[in-house]
Amino acid sequence: MALTLRVCSTFLRSCSSNSKSVLSGLSSVRFRSSCPVLISHLDHLVLTVRDLNKTTKFYSEVLGMEVVTFKGDRKALSFGEQKINLHQVGKEFEPKAQTPTPGSADLCLITKTPLKAVADHLKACGVTIEEGPVDRTGAVGPISSLYFRDPDDNLIEVSNYQQ
């Protein structure tokens, strides 16, 4: 790996007059890990929230997620092949994050719905758009994004992959 990086670095330096144009064409650089553990996808994450009812209403009405009740009265938000488990602050399930805090998340959600339609729907739901649409870099390529907040002030980014 060190040799590969050294060769790449030497190549870029040798293209000194060209290096800015070479680098400007790169949207991101990925390095392969030698770790034997390969993660395939995210199954679920946990949001700590102040009010389960406000949160489930927001995510179901504004973002179309399905509210799921499991293991008695636990709540989750289901979409695609993922879910967001909800923990009410002060009533978290073990094990839990070291400092579970409402409003500390920053989530990027991908949709195929055009962002204009998303923006119109957000406005109709009384949700304030903080920014966007703006161009960003997603996990698998360029995206266009809208930013807004959920009832706990988590930052929510809804994005389309650019063609």
Swiss-Prot record:
Residues 41-161 form the VOC domain. InterPro entries: Glyas_Bleomycin-R_OHBP_Dase, Glyas_Fos-R_dOase_dom, GlyoxalaseI/FosfomycinResist, VOC. Belongs to the glyoxalase I family. This is Glyoxalase domain-containing protein 5.
